[in-house]
Amino acid sequence: MKDIVPPPPPVVRNDVAAVQALFQQHVVPSYGRFDLVLSHGSGRYLYDITGRRFLDLGGGIAVSSLGHAHPAITEALVEQSRKVIHTSNFYYHEPQGRLAQALVSLIGPGKCFFGNSGVEANEGLFKLARKFGHDEGRFEVLTTINSFHGRTLAGIAATGQEKVKKGFEPMVPGFRQVPYNDLDAMRAAVSPATAAILIEGIQGEGGVTPARPDYLLGLRELCNEKKLLLFMDSVQCGHFRSGRFQSFQRILEGVPGGDAFLPDGISMAKSLGGGFPIGAFWVRAPYADLLGAGTHGTTYGGSPLACAVALKILDVIQREKLADNVRQVGAALKSGLEQLVHKYPSVLQTVRGLGLMLGLELAPNIARLPGDPSKTQAVRFANLLHGAGLLTIPAGAQILRFLPPLNLQASEAAEGLRILEEVVAPLAA
């Protein structure tokens, strides 16, 4: 047996290069990382190992629903870990049952399955579609161009972006993409092999583009007509990020027939655990028992610890009325971004999105933008914002996403807008 190797000594507090060297030597280089070494967080702020503070308007890509080091999450982690962390799904435990009950109450009649991530949730929906259509030879899932559904083999096959597929061909069969928000294209794509349609209520990686109300209602009608399952990928746009639990609920507010809209399956993750790994999919009642015993499973999914954390987050969101906060602060942030677009059209082009899921599109070919020209404008712009103390998330070559914690304060949104203008103004001069 190999001798046990003692852990290396901790890196000196402010030695950024030493930490980066650990990654270069020991971590698979599958991520393009920014030159920041973060050490801790508090509320809506993150700190690096040199002591610099950053306002986090990226939220770990829509994950940090309550910000950083929230006492309620810490309490839930400690309290549940003192009881039991993991049991396996051979046994019942209360937190999983209560969390499923809570999610069903927020969506509609159905049942939930729990995993560890968004892509696992989507994989569950893919298997559900195959099970649903199996006896008729239907297995195909239609998705949309510019969509993003994860990085497993099925996830990249479902994703409507060629960059994630390159080098991993041949693709898993059974997925085709059509333009987003184009009902005629989706209808034309349905074939005898089609079992389901999967879309995002708001495309995230594809540029923060919300679905149109008529598109959602038309898809439901199409699926009813063709006997297809309608799935929604709510991994990024769900969990109150739009101001309602599900983005389709917000998009269809006040729209005739909108209250009756319900998909057949929904994938969830990210904000659900606030940083603790958990994913889930909800299945509408008529199809909730398709995946019977032995057809699907996961070792860690729905552990007592993960479910206790998710329950506590839901409790805080509802008790502190954070859905209202998302609407109010999100509207102020969007308005502020639109004012900057109007003021600096040579740098900023458009704003889109709902609630606290906003996309800021940069103008093409910003002449004064510094940085490595081999990098996208979005990455170079994000680097400038880092230098000023603001974190955002690039989406594609031209878009910055704002995906902050749901408890972002109005004063913090104003601070973010001030920092953004400080960076933009010299570029427009």
PLM regions and their residue ranges:
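Conserved N-terminal phosphate-binding loop of PLP-dependent enzymes in the Aspartate aminotransferase
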Residues: K2-A429
